[in-house]
Design a protein with these regions (language model features):
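A conserved mid-protein helix/loop that constitutes part of the nucleotide-sugar donor-binding site
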Residues: 22, 225, 234-248, 425-428
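A short, active-site helix/loop in glycosyltransferases that binds the activated sugar's phosphate group
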Residues: 157-194, 204
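Glycosyltransferase donor-sugar binding loop
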Residues: 257-276
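Nucleotide-activated donor-binding/catalytic signature segment of Leloir-type glycosyltransferases, i.e.
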Residues: 274-303
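Aromatic "clamp/platform" in nucleotide-sugar-dependent glycosyltransferases that forms part
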Residues: 316
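N-proximal low-complexity "stem/linker" segments adjacent to membrane-targeting elements
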Residues: 397-433
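Short, acidic, metal-binding catalytic loop of nucleotide-sugar glycosyltransferases
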Residues: 432-441
Length: 445
């Protein structure tokens, strides 16, 4: 079987409940179970959101499922005067060159981890026998548009470009939704012809729930329906739409509601955090309000699978969210906005019952309807067998990209012209960089 590397800045364990981490953990365990030799390279070094387990603990846990969990951080031997994401991508290139043993490498476009590695392959210098699959999830530009966020500085614009180029230089692109491919094409990205829509694999269920977190259960169902906002507590996830819809609840509606829960990560919203924003907006609601932010994915799913729960997912923009996916595969009652790739997850005949336009009025109307018709469980549009088969086919598919080999006999003189004025330190850095080039026929002027 082929040797596969899944390279990701987000993986279950070190990261608590990210969508990319959920997707790549699910893919890694699916491939390992099939018999592939799977390594996972976590690219954020020592960063961890896990208080109960170290990275070594998680590496040991993953090994029990046939996966070798590795990590890499910024290279310290080279002084790189560049933004973090560029230093990180170059450090990853060096790691991949030292560990050039993989038949297939899978990564996402977010953070542009693969930029320099793909550039090296396109230049004909490395990775002739490695196929790179970019599994698109959410570029920074796409996320910023959803959050109505302008770029912070020129570095942000550079990241936009690098993430775009990661997609364009890929040997193959796999997206969990046609929507995201259409979005990239609409931005005039040169998406490779070898592109496919394959849903994410079902979330891995083998991890134990955290012992330091007690998930509330209701063996005796509450007298009313609990509304659960499920997702990161931010604008893009529809937080404000949900809060405004709650204000429209009538006294009759409230009689059938046991409480409102916000289940997701706390984030900064301007000068305050989402906790403060939620409490300010719900202080006169007249219903019990609960905010839960310390659950990982496993704990969160145990919570929403309880009885008399109606999950609300009012996102403004989404690719193929696991919040919806997990409701579908776990038979959880839910409502979701009809944006992005969400409708692609749900059988067409159930769209009218579970989808809404992301406005407070339309969301309230659907909540009002579902309070009286709660049990609607459409199931995922595709079987796990078909999803897994599509992924196995992607791994086995031959790389048809043309590798441009360097002509060793053709070594023209390269003139490097450096402009400088009273910046001796930076000039020394530039000259030192030129001296370390592997190409020797160089002159400096």
């Amino acid at each position: 079987m082929k040797k596969v590397l899944i390279m990701t800045p987000d993986i279950e364990g070190p990261v608590r409940n990210g969508g990319i981490g959920t997707a790549f953990t699910a893919l890694a365990t699916t491939l390992a179970k099939k018999g592939y030799d799977v390594d996972v390279l976590y690219t954020c070094g020592d960063y961890s959101e896990s208080s109960a387990s170290t990275f070594s603990d998680w590496s040991r846990i993953y090994s029990t499922f046939g996966i070798n969990l590795l990590s890499t951080g910024l290279v310290k031997e080279i002084n790189i005067d560049a933004p973090y994401f560029r230093r990180k991508s170059y450090s990853i290139l060096l790691w991949l060159k030292e560990n050039n043993v993989y038949d297939t490498i899978i990564s996402c476009e977010w953070q542009a981890d693969l930029y320099y590695a793909l550039l090296s392959k396109k230049n004909g210098t490395d990775f002739e026998n490695t196929k790179f699959i970019v599994n698109t999830h959410s570029s920074t530009l796409w996320a910023d548009e959803g959050n109505y966020q302008l770029p912070y500085d020129q570095n942000h614009l550079e990241l936009y470009y690098m993430e775009k180029m990661v997609v364009e230089m890929a040997d193959e692109v796999v997206s969990p939704s046609q929507y995201l491919i259409d979005w990239m094409l609409g931005k005039h990205w040169n998406v490779p012809e070898e592109r496919h829509v394959i849903l994410n694999c079902e979330p891995f269920q083998g991890f134990e729930t955290r012992s330091d977190v007690v998930v509330k259960t209701n063996e005796t169902p509450a007298s009313g329906v609990e509304l659960v906002f499920f997702g990161r507590l931010e604008t893009r996830k529809g937080l404000d739409i949900f809060l405004r819809a709650l204000r429209k609840l009538s006294d009759e509606d409230k009689e059938t509601i046991s409480g409102v829960t916000f289940l997701g990560k706390n984030v900064t919203l301007g000068k305050i955090d989402s906790f403060t924003h939620i409490m300010n907006q719900t202080k006169n609601l007249g219903l019990a309000v609960n905010i839960i932010s310390d659950y990982d994915r496993t704990n969160a799913n145990e919570y929403i699978k309880r009885k008399n729960v109606l999950v609300i997912i009012p996102s403004l923009v989404e690719n193929s969210p696991y919040t919806v996916y997990e409701c579908l595969v776990n038979n959880v009652n839910f409502l979701a906005s009809n944006v992005g790739g969400i409708p692609e997850l749900i059988p067409q005949e159930h769209h009218a019952e579970v989808l809404f336009t992301p406005t407070p009025v339309d969301l309230y109307g659907k909540i009002h309807y579902r309070l009286k018709n709660i049990n609607i469980k459409p199931g995922l549009v595709e079987s796990q067998e078909n999803i897994q088969a599509a992924w196995f086919a992607a791994i086995e598919r031959k790389d048809n990209s043309v590798f441009k080999k360097i002509d060793e006999s053709n070594r023209p003189l390269v003139s490097v012209c450096i402009t400088h004025f009273d910046r001796h330190h930076l000039l020394q850095q530039a000259l030192a960089s030129i001296k370390t080039q592997t190409y020797q026929n160089i002159e400096v002027s």
